[in-house]
């Protein structure tokens, strides 16, 4: 039976253990082998919807998808029961066989975030936040090295206990990967745990070499994308063993600085610790937005959306109290009929005021976008953002106009923060092709579902 320690006692117990065993609080990997968990919630969105309906996801055919996007809508998640029938998790509604009967749940991103926060809170009942890295909404890494002796359990028993806790409290099934470094924990989750009856996989460096060096396809491995696999194929390499046999200079010539990552991972090595992740600070900063349009848009219609996205970006910059002098645009076309177009414009001012940013974005869009080919994807980025204290304008700037616009933009931001993003809008948002009014109710590009507690849209 596992003794349950709440978060307010964990630190005291760890200090006691360190005193008794003379263990320093932090060690490098060379001093002591560490044990990491990578815990993933199975088909998270679908499992949450089943939990809300008091259904068993292993016995229920349920899909999370936005029916307002038509029969070709992307399935954000399907239940394990549907996956067991050979249906792919990220399929489209039209891909599901007609013979399969299923329930469709509209996305409720706010609800999923609430569940994720509750699960993180559960972790905090047993672990220090410095030992937890949240990788995504449904996946987290935990360094349990110092907790195994604390709880008097081995790595399997503690993992099973956590999985049972999540299931008992929130009715969400989970899977766990255990590894001697972060990479091996992730691979144990993604590959090994799938074949384990208890949904727990374990890998150390030797076991990794014995069981996965010849595993194919190589794209099953974390951080190996299809493009990387294609470049490896040119050298006759199709698995991790093949990477270990490639000349180092060839690897660096082909993959640049990413070669070091590929080589380390091929050997099952990963020197990065959770503390390194938490201490990392990016040298450059940007704010970006992207969206997939609900249908094919003409160049003129998409221009309206870029205008909206720029206004939204200006508000976000002001909210974060940062400014920029670089605007970038990305345009993707229907069915990849032609290569995407993109460009970057440098302003002669450093600002977060919409008038300057919209003017630059519209000029850039008109200069770089194909006026004929239908458009389906749009993106905008504000690069090299910095603190508002660095704001700068040129000699010809109308300072009275700048102050009026800044005051108006602040007022609109305050109103929208208090009463909702649609409380006050610009005229462009009421154009029929505009998307911002609807997207203001989205989280991560999907419906938030704030008023959807019963799963009704």
Where are these regions (language model features)?
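Residues that scaffold, gate, or flank divalent-cation-dependent active/transport sites
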Residues: 2-137, 141, 266
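Acidic, metal-coordinating catalytic segment for phosphate/diphosphate chemistry
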Residues: 10, 48, 343, 347-457
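DNA-contacting surface of Y-family translesion DNA polymerases
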Residues: 38, 230-374
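Short acidic, glycine/serine/threonine-rich loops at helix termini
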Residues: 48-50, 74-77, 184-192, 234, ...
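Short Gly/Ser/Thr- and Asp/Glu-enriched loop/turn motifs at secondary-structure junctions
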Residues: 135-139, 179-182, 322-326, 373-377
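Catalytic palm subdomain of template-directed nucleic-acid polymerases
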Residues: 142-163, 192, 236
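Long, highly charged, low-complexity intrinsically disordered interaction regions
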Residues: 158-216
């Amino acid at each position: 039976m596992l003794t349950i320690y709440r978060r307010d006692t964990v630190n005291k117990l760890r200090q006691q253990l360190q005193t008794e065993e003379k263990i320093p609080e932090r060690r490098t990997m060379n001093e002591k082998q560490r044990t990491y968990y990578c815990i993933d919630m199975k088909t998270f969105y679908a499992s949450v919807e089943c939990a809300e309906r008091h259904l068993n996801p292993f016995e229920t055919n349920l899909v999370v998808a936005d029916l307002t996007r038509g029969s070709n809508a992307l399935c954000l998640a399907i239940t394990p029961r549907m996956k067991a029938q050979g249906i792919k998790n990220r399929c489209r509604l039209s891909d599901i066989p007609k013979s399969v009967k299923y329930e469709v749940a509209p996305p409720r991103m706010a609800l999923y975030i609430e569940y994720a926060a509750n699960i993180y809170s559960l972790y905090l009942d047993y672990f220090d936040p410095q030992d937890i890295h949240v990788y995504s909404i449904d996946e987290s890494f935990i360094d349990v090295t110092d907790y195994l002796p604390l709880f008097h359990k081995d790595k399997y028993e503690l993992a099973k206990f956590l999985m049972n806790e999540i299931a008992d409290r929130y009715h969400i099934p989970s899977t766990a990967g255990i590894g001697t470094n972060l990479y091996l924990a992730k691979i144990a989750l993604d590959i090994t745990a799938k074949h384990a009856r208890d949904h727990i996989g374990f890998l150390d460096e030797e076991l990794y070499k014995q069981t996965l060096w010849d595993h194919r396809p190589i794209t099953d491995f974390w951080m190996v994308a299809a493009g990387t696999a294609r470049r490896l194929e040119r050298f006759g390499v199709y698995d991790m063993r093949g990477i270990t046999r490639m000349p180092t200079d060839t690897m660096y010539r082909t993959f640049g600085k990413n070669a070091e990552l590929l080589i380390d991972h091929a050997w099952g090595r990963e020197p990065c610790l959770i503390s390194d992740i938490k201490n990392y600070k990016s040298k450059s900063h940007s704010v970006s937005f992207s969206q997939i349009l609900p249908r094919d848009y003409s160049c003129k219609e998409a221009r309206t959306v870029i205008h909206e996205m720029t206004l939204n970006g200006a508000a976000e910059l002001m909210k974060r109290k940062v400014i920029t002098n670089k605007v970038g645009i990305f345009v993707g076309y229907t069915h990849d009929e032609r290569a995407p177009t993109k460009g970057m414009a440098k302003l002669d001012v450093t600002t977060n005021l919409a008038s300057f940013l919209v003017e630059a974005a519209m000029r850039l869009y008109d200069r770089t976008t194909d006026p004929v080919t239908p458009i389906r994807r749009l993106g905008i980025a504000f690069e090299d953002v910095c603190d508002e204290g660095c704001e700068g304008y040129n000699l010809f700037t109308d300072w009275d106009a700048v102050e009026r616009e800044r005051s108006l933009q602040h007022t609109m931001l305050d109103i929208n923060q208090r009463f909702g993003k649609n409380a006050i809008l610009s005229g462009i948002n009421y154009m029929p092709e505009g998307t911002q009014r609807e997207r203001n109710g989205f989280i991560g590009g999907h419906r938030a579902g704030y008023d959807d507690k019963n799963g009704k849209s």
